[in-house]
Amino acid sequence: MKNLKENLLPTFNQYILPNGMRIIHEPSASKVAYCGFAVDAGTRDELENEQGMAHFVEHLIFKGTAKRKAWHILNRMENVGGDLNAYTNKEETVIYSAFLTEHFGRAFELLVDIVFHSTFPQREIEKETEVIIDEIQSYEDNPSELIFDDFEDLIFRGHPL
């Protein structure tokens, strides 16, 4: 059984930097790599008057940094066949990239720039507000999403999740 476990389960290495940031690494022979930042902040952390902010910020971080406009952010990984994306859930906000291993430096530098140097341009805030409103309306028109939300409310009553 031990041999089976060793062969099937991935081996993760974990490092904790002096600033508390945790790095998790899984060695792989694949030519495709994934890199990202998971921020321990999601919708559960929002106060009632802040609902939707985590998701809003997730959208806005792609809209500009101190050295890049939105177009440059979106095309930086696409130009080399990579992908750049993000998502927000109740527990976390994640921004990540998938790319050929030879482009690790490019992906990591871009992610660091986005996570630590986003500028949140006013004109983009106004545009993205409309996008988020459309997403909310689409979500509210989806019965399965509404049922799932009601189910979670019953299970986690009185809990941030």
Feature names for model-found ranges:
Residues 1-73, 109:
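His/Glu-rich zincin catalytic helix
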Residues 66, 73-161:
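Acidic/histidine-enriched segments that form metal/cofactor-coordinating
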